[in-house]
Amino acid sequence: MEARRLAILCSHLNPPGPNPTRDPTLRVSDCSSGSSGDGKVESSTLQNDCVFCKIIRGESPCLKLYEDDMCLCILDTNPLSHGHSLIIPKLHYPTLEETPPSVVAAMCSKVPLISNAIVKATGSDSFNLLVNNGAAAGQVIFHTHIHIIPRKERDCLWASESLRRHSLKLDKEASQLVSCVRRHLCSLPEEQLVQPS
């Protein structure tokens, strides 16, 4: 698992292909987030060794598809399919739990726009939206990000039918799970549960 993480990190730092100084399609992203009023991300909100923070600071190359003051979307340098892209917040949050709801909302609000453009550009039929949150879920870069993975019929990437699934048993165990989740939700401050109007 560690070797895989290292390989993916290296692939994001050193994308395969032409030298970025000679290829005009490779762009280094700037750090415009507007968070400090001068258009720059404050250095305290970025991590020195995070590959995505390096991209945001302009220290590593990327193929940028979209950018605004909250997030950017880049092509994944180790794609599962043609057009596999990542939506990344411009500030460093290691996991989804640590990412403020407003940042998650800003990232998710871009999904229809970006995914539609990617699906059209790649001639895909559909796409998967994926978040690997935590090591056990396969997260290898600990900077929150959302994968947009374009799909075509019979692409053999994976199918939900290929996963071993079991019917939910409406039993005591399921009821206990529902009660436990509800207790955790009830323990949250009300402002976290109420959506702004």
Curated annotation (Swiss-Prot):
Active site: 145
Primary location: other
Gene3D superfamilies (alphabetical): HIT-like (3.30.428.10)
CDD domains referenced in this protein's UniProt entry, alphabetically: HINT_subgroup (cd01277)
UniProt keywords, alphabetically: Hydrolase, Nucleotide-binding, Peroxisome
HIT domain ranges (all copies): 51-158
One GO cellular component, as annotated: peroxisome
Record InterPro entries: HINT, Histidine_triad_CS, Histidine_triad_HIT, HIT-like, HIT-like_sf
Name of the protein in its database record: Adenylylsulfatase HINT3
UniProt source species: Arabidopsis thaliana (Mouse-ear cress)
